[in-house]
Amino acid sequence: MTQKEFNFSIYNTKFYGQYWQAKETSAVIVLAHGMGEHSNRYQHVAKKLTEHNFSAVAFDHFGHGKTEGKRGHNPSFEAVLESISKVIEKAKEFFPNKPLFLYGHSMGGNAVINYTIRKNHQLAGTIATSPFLKLAFKPPAIKLFVGKMLQNIVPSLTMGNELDVQAISREKEEVKKYIEDPLVHAKISPN
């Protein structure tokens, strides 16, 4: 397995990306991470994929990991979908004429499902694990009202995402790594 880094820019933001190349690539999987995470947290997934002749391409979303920007903020959901388009372009550049799959987890799962529905560019398939399709709880009406107001007034305002870190995995070591990872954050913006 060979690992390489790359960058691209959209919305005046420099994105960090990386890819893992299998010895013989049969297909490519573009990975979209979850809220507060970054692409490096999926190295173990990339390793397993390359062992089965799948190369993997991943990137850090707006305001995540090594990508520039305020932690937890993105300009818009459309901008998130455009960033996925850019990574797909990069994947096609690195691995021409190979079948391409999208894989997303949690927030990334929501993004890849929406991308597939709205912009499917000849994808071989889409995989989503624990996709964020709706909130796990119903927030108070006042919180929803204030959130919608803030989205129009101060869209880049970030606040805690209220994620229960203990619930991200049943493996205590995985939870510990998540908590201790300096590139993981617990921020979210109204956008």
Predicted regions and their residues:
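Active-site glycine-rich loops that stabilize anionic/oxyanionic intermediates
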Residues: 26, 34-37
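Catalytic nucleophile-loop/oxyanion-hole region of alpha/beta-hydrolase
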Residues: 36-39, 65-95, 99
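The conserved beta1-alpha1 loop
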Residues: 30-34, 105
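Alpha/beta-hydrolase-fold enzymes
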Residues: 107-189
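Conserved alpha/beta-hydrolase
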Residues: 41, 46-70
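N-terminal cap/lid segment of alpha/beta-hydrolase-fold proteins
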Residues: 1-24
